[in-house]
Amino acid sequence: VAEAMQMGISTGLALAGFIPVTIYPRLDFLLLAMDQLVNHLDKLECMSQGQFRPQVIIRTMLGATYPLDPGPQHSGNYLMALRGMLTNINVWSVSQPASILETYRTALESMRSSIVIEVDRDKRLEYR
């Protein structure tokens, strides 16, 4: 998978009026799309002086380490780093299954790009 291309295509679709939902199976994979995310999607509204306001919903997961440990390359938590780098993109962490659907509804209605990080139950207490 070409993660940067995936984010670039999603941004392009958003500029064309669509609201794409793009999925990165692990939060670590989103790191490979950081140029498109930080330097393009997050800054397009500012760079275009408000003319363009692309909305992309990004789904990713901070996964379980039990029963199968994905190892250090697939279990990094970059939630706070994302919140620090992104000024025009909502970053949400969801750990309760009952609130996942509502979080996606909020992301859709927010009129802004959003990252929804689904946190597996065994990571919930470790990464608040």
Predicted features, each with a name:
Residues A2-M5, T11-R128:
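Conserved thiamine diphosphate
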